[in-house]
Amino acid sequence: MNSDTCVVETTPELEITCSPVVARAAVGLVAIKDEMDALGRSAAGSAIVGQIFPDWRGHRTLDPHSFAAQVIPFYWYARSKQSSDSFTPRYLALVPTSIVVGESWRWSPAHLNDREQEKVIEKTFNAFSSSSPERVDSECAQYTHIRPLGIVLAHEGKNRVALFKERQLTHIPAMVWDEGYLAPERLRIFELAGTCLAVLDGRLVERVVALHLVRELMEAYGVEVERRWPEDFAELKQVLEDLDDSSTKFHYLPYATDMDKLRLDAACLNTEVEATLLDIDAVRLPPLKTFLHAGIALVVLLLSVGMCAGRWPNLQLLLATAAGALGMLVTVPVLPFVRCKVRHLKDSERMRQFFDLRHHRTRTQRGTAVDPGS
């Protein structure tokens, strides 16, 4: 195809700026995704893929960007920051087929005969040749290039990626957008008993769904996998409980918990406040009828004190003392004379005190808060 030859000769290849070791790891991850897509074409294979991504509720395979969000720690965060902070220009390039993540969800090469495959390839080159950064043909492949990781994610033209690979075509012509990624020093990955976690800036925490898929890439990028949870982080149990909260399940993006929020919550729960005996969860007071009887007895004692005035001063003093003691016993449970940590209060009082403290501290810290992405 002469037009195809012209396009290949005049269009530059995609510039790979990551290190060679990262590039090799990226090719390995893309190859794994290709194998997963192949498995997804059968019921048994889909079941195997489902064991890796049990919470995925989309198509039988993951689209490229969802795959990246699932396996690359905080890819979704890096992408959201770039999308909100700047506009990235697009350009035409010949993209190495081996680094492109596709998705054969509509059709695969096996669904097409040789002539149909040739038509798809021809259409790809024709759409590419008629496209420019200012105007993109609807059939032109459109890709996202994560430059620091050396991976390309297909946005438009996902199905044809497998065809180019099966035909052993070394490059796919595409319109490309560049994306960045988080600097390796901002990330930490922890492989712990029963779970794997990624931490961004010592603050945000998300689960690493499939560390075995992305370990080589992350280590090549400069993020070592650690096995001990730092003591200066929020308590691991608290982090896992927040990540396991049912309200965070089946979210479109991986859920991340904020350790600053968890530290603030813990500080509020451990704050001592004035409380009554009625507010403390561990205190078990006598039933209400006991206080009613005591109140009646107090009234009787007070009346008796009045009746004894002037006639039996010693008895009056004794009754007054008893009335005072009984009055103290009746009123002590409702007097805020003890200090207690918020976490030890009864539910209603604990929540009231907790939200009051949290609101106050949040307002105090708002002026000095720093965005973890800044």
Which residues fall in each region the model found?
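Short alpha-helix boundary/capping and kink motifs at helix termini
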Residues: 7-151
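Charged, amphipathic alpha-helical linkers/stalks
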Residues: 181-233
